[in-house]
Amino acid sequence: MTAQRPTPEQIIRYEKDPKTKIATITFDRPEFLNAPTSMARLRYADVLRAANTDNDVKVVIIRGVGDNLGSGADLPEFMEGNDNPAARLAELRLEDDGVGEVSYPPKGTFRNGATISAWYANSQAGNRALQDFKKISIVEAKGYCYGWHFYQCADADLVISSDDALFGHPSFRYHGWGPRMWTWVQMMGLRKFQEMVF
């Protein structure tokens, strides 16, 4: 059973001011610590791609509603996708792409996990879209900056952080490393990075 979730447009709000040339992306799901659904991550990638092209945008500010930038992905939705190949194909933008019927690799196969993992490395998936953004990006970090939101901080040109901001990624606990760790280490040095993450 799939839970009711807000639309991508409700979770990822986008506004621009052509006069100042500043666009704002707001994560707006505070009751779930601004966790984006897979479709919201796709919208985020699309919005950044549009802002990258738009001559009326020179700077993008990224912020979260409530006390946190965000706690990472919508994990219940991700887990539902493990049993719903149609949801995975939709996330991969393959549900109706004009090439005919596509079957998602079955559970228990290497390709099942590798397919979604490879997709997450693609900027169109919304995980590293900010890394490919060619204009100025500023993230307002506060509260939890965890998982997917940690990526956004790592990929931004400038992070303005509150004193209570907590940076981290679940991979630190479960794998010993995390995507984008090298970005942070290069920017601030290993010791400062180790002090920063929780």
Where are these regions (language model features)?
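Glycine- (often His-adjacent) and acidic-residue-rich active-site loop
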Residues: F32, G64-A125, C145
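Short, flexible helix/strand-to-coil boundary loops that buttress conserved ligand/catalytic motifs
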Residues: P36-T37, A73, N82, S171, ...
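Catalytic-core regions built around general acid/base machinery
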Residues: V47-A50, N122-K134
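Crotonase-fold acyl-CoA enzyme core
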Residues: R128-F198
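Conserved CoA-thioester-binding segment of acyl-CoA-metabolizing enzymes
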Residues: M1-V65, M79-A86
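Short secondary-structure boundary/capping elements
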Residues: P6-T7, D17, A118-N122, G176
